[in-house]
Amino acid sequence: MKILLYIAIILSFFSLITISSECKIAVLLSGSPNDLGYNYLMNEARVKAESELKLDFSIYYENLEESMEEAEKAFQDALHKGANLIVVGSFVHVGLGLKYAALTKDQDIYWIIRGNKRPNPDLPHVVILNFNSFELHYLLGYFSGLMTKTGIVGFVAPGPDVNTISTDNSFYLGAKYARPNITFLNVYVQSWYNPNVSYSAAKMLIKNGADLIGMSQDDMSCQKAMMDSGLIGIGATGYPTHLLFGGNVGVSYITNWTNLYVKYAQHVLNDDWPDYSSYFTNLSREDSIFIDDYSYKVPIDIQNLVNDEIQRLKNTSYIPYRSDPYLAQLGIPFDSKGLLVEDQFRANKKLLKGDSISKVIDFGQYSIPIEFIDYPNSLKYGVTIVSGVCIFICLVCMTLVVVFKKARVIKSSSPAFLLLILLGCCIIFAACILFAQSPTNQTCSARIWLLSLGYTLFLGNLLVKNWRIWLLFDNPKLKKRAITNWKLYPWVFAILAIDVMILAIWQGLGNINAESRIGYDSLTQYQYKNVCSSDDQGSIALYLLLVFHGLVLLVACFISFKIKVVDIEEFNESKPITTSVYIITFCLFIVIPLMVSPQSLTSQTTIICVCAIVTTLISMLLLFGSKFYKMATQGLAINETFATSTKSSSKSSKSSYGKDNPNPNAINFGEDDTSDETSEEKHKSPKQKSVNFSNKSNSHLAVFTSDEETSKTSKLSIDFENSSKDISIDQLQQQKQQPINTNGDLENKSNDKIDDDNDNSSVLSKRISNQQNGETEIDSNNV
């Protein structure tokens, strides 16, 4: 008894040693484990085996079909990490699997390799995995022949360079058996796993009338094309596709490799590997291959017919895909059982031809045509229409400025500069139209030129026009300053010249052109877009251009701030200008981060166009809308002087003569000056006259000097001194002299400062009005 006890203990000890052997699984996949197809199921079996056997280590490698070099690295890495059960799941890597299996044949490393037959010379640690895919494709072809409404079915296969054509022939024979007059469409995609090509190939078959499509791909791309076209799909990847697509999949075959993994992992753990083993499975074994439930869209009578065919296929003597006499055209001999010789059948590279009833159309190798992807029509048409409307508005505004150039609100804002500003707006809108079109070598340069020049004209003229107002009103000593339009044009041209110079550098050094880029902007590898590109020197010049426009914006902001104190409405455009500049700056703070962050080309173009149109249109409405509104509501006011703000008016009312005015014929500063220069005045010789007003206050002298286009000078001196002679307004008008507003008698010294302020306001009002139109300069040194 003791001897038996010792023997039992020893056996238990060795049993524990055997069970404690490690099993590290490595799975090499041809595609993605997320394809919901063959690769997914191979990896799912690894996960389930790891969980069931409580393994400490397992690993997988994906997308190895793309590069044999990467596949070889995966083999080496798996061996380096100590994997001792390596699964090679694809026919593509059979050669590499057998190579490394031969190199490690003397080690405790075991292999499961998918293939058709055992290697020669044979390797004891290799299990050959295969399943009867021919009967499955035959069954799905039979189902398709029963379900088709058009009488046309299709098949997508890797092709003769990758796989046997017997899968294609099996599907065709199944469909022909169900419907003898079937039309069969066949196409090759040169890969087990290329979703883009497979999807496009299936779409091509659908366009040619196929309403059911079989495949020998590792993913559901073909069936997705079917369902996207409103047709019913069939599951040919081994995944229970009804879990994902529901009733849109008519029927699927299911493969479950967990039993395979667990079986051979236990052999590794128990150290009892079955040498020279093979794992061939089919419907009859019911261990790894099953048929899924039918969709509710499949009629019951068709379900019954398919079930009957399944039962016949489970009889191993029923092999219609190898025994049909129609197969004789392949040139493969039949064996004694009336079947095509298996090895030659599996290696067949020839597609069956049609007969007098059925028809076979071979599309051969399929390649996706390279497709040009343009901007969406919504962007192209939307930007073009909106920009066109904005250009029309600009032209209308330009017409109004020209027609009503002598109106008070237009004349005070310098019509010439207003026209240049509107011209800049038109150019900006034209640039937006070019931005919305597909780039070409010409438009890549033209749109940048137009956009830059447009903003330079727009902001540059605003800057210069308001710089003059700042210089004239920022004049505490009331010195004589003559700044006509012709003195400002060189500044505008200087700003424009700087812009043109930078653009010329960008154009000359940047090598600006349009490139066709495949796979750009989240496109597939079979789609391309035209993209504007430049060299590094061009990028530097473009950044310099952005800095230049940024400086123009800053200067415009500064000048707008400086003229905000001007209390004469017609001259003080600081509010609309500042608002316009702020809007542009705000958009830049939005545009720049969006442009730097990853964005599609369409999104970038949309952002640029929308911001350019919105900022320019709002700025234009702010600058011109108020002017035209005043013209419409208050009249053209061509013969009226300039209205001041509330603050200015209140000062004028305090300093003017009221009920206590001893001289009813005196003219008051602060009141509207209704006079205007006429063409007759411009041709009269200058004269100087003294006009005496009786006033008890101290004497004052104001001298107005007119700078006409003829460069002649006329002076009007008004000498306020003690005199009993009064001159009325009518007498002044008869002499065709501009009426001069005075503050009359000052009742006390406390009002002197207010009088001087109003004198200055009126003098400056008249001066800026005339000088902006190149007509008059005012010398007020003696006020």
From Swiss-Prot:
Polar residues: bias regions: 763-783
Annotated keywords: Cell membrane, Coiled coil, Endoplasmic reticulum, G-protein coupled receptor, Glycoprotein, Golgi apparatus, Membrane, Nucleus, Receptor, Signal, Transducer, Transmembrane, Transmembrane helix
GO molecular-function term, one example from the UniProt record: G protein-coupled receptor activity
Superkingdom assignment: Eukaryota
GO cellular component labels: endoplasmic reticulum membrane; Golgi membrane; nuclear envelope; organelle membrane; plasma membrane
Region (Disordered): 647-696, 731-783
Main location: membrane
Cytoplasmic face of the membrane: 405-415, 465-489, 560-575, 626-783
Compositionally biased residues, Low complexity: 647-656
Acidic residues: compositionally biased ranges: 670-679
Phenotype when the gene is knocked out: Cells show precocious development. Alterations are also noted at the slug stage and in spore formation. Slugs are longer and break apart several times on their way to culmination forming smaller but proportionate fruiting bodies. Spores from fruiting bodies are malformed and less viable, although the spore differentiation factors are synthesized and sensed normally. Mutant completes development 6 hours earlier.
Glycosylation sites: N181, N196, N256, N282, N315, N441
Coiled coil, from the record: 56-85
Extracellular face residues: 21-383, 437-443, 511-538, 597-604
Annotated TM spans: 384-404, 416-436, 444-464, 490-510, 539-559, 576-596, 605-625
GO biological process: G protein-coupled receptor signaling pathway; response to N-phenylthiourea; slug development involved in sorocarp development; sorocarp development; sporulation resulting in formation of a cellular spore
Membrane topology term: Multi-pass membrane protein
One Pfam family matching this protein: Bmp
Signal sequence interval, chain numbering: 1-20
Compartment(s): Cell membrane; Membrane; Endoplasmic reticulum membrane; Golgi apparatus membrane
InterPro entries on file: GPCR_3_C (IPR017978), mGluR/GABA-B-like (IPR051530), PnrA-like (IPR003760)
Role according to the record: May act during the development and be a negative regulator.
Family: In the N-terminal section; belongs to the BMP lipoprotein family.
Protein name (record): Metabotropic glutamate receptor-like protein J
Species this chain originates from: Dictyostelium discoideum
